[in-house]
């Protein structure tokens, strides 16, 4: 536990490390913060926080991810007021790259300095490793990141539609269902190193237990991988020209699994994937 702080509420706040036992509490902070953000952005779609049944379904779907992040985090900090968790932040390190996975503060406590305090704990100023994050467009949060030298590189949009069973797209790719084997993880990690310049084997071991993984080969050599499930992705391909064939296959697999929704987050710099998705009736969420 570390020193306490006092917000504009004149209520004492203490900061303490988090653990897997705090997963549900931080899930609720995220859901309430996200609902507030969507309201401020003018989005009218209902969020799960107002519907106990929907909230329970969302927690059931995401609990494994929260537990995985808690188990593999490098820094995980909570802001507490009494027994209530009012904010949290977490970062992971993968092969020398630090990723800020979450930074969320309850609406009533935003702009009180809690975000800055939490960020300082999970992104140490003296650290020299490479850093990145996937951030919302919330301007106060953006200001925090910019002050720490984290600058936007590109936007990421969520594309989705009801999946269709599609004819196989003409391609010389061979598609193989991946098993949770050391060999498959090694292949995926090698491709991560080649394209992303770091490995994330611990995440592949979790992903392949949650979703159906696929390896893509050309002339006997691995050229990519992807995951399809209740949540799909990530997809990594050494040649972006393969995205139409891979996404056609992935959508068909989602339909074959009986899913009513197929969606994935796509960096808009991936023009081949974006063009394919838009030309095939996918919708965009902010």
Describe each region flagged by the PLM:
Residues 2, 136-137, 143, 148-168, ...:
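Active-site/acyl-donor-binding loops of N-acyltransferases
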Residues 128, 147-231, 246:
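Amide-forming acyltransferase catalytic core, primarily the GNAT-like/NAT-type
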Residues 30-76, 80-82, 193-213:
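Active-site rim helix/loop that mediates acceptor-substrate recognition in acyltransferases
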Residues 98-101, 125-138, 257-267:
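Conserved GNAT acetyl-CoA-binding A-motif
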Residues 76-78, 83-92, 99-104, 215, ...:
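Conserved beta-strand in the GNAT
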Residues 14-28, 35-39, 173-188:
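A short beta-loop-alpha structural element at the N-terminal edge
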Residues 102-105, 111-124, 142-147, 241-253:
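Conserved acetyl-CoA-binding loop-helix of GNAT-fold acetyltransferases
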Residues 210-216, 223-266:
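Flexible loop/N-cap segments at domain edges
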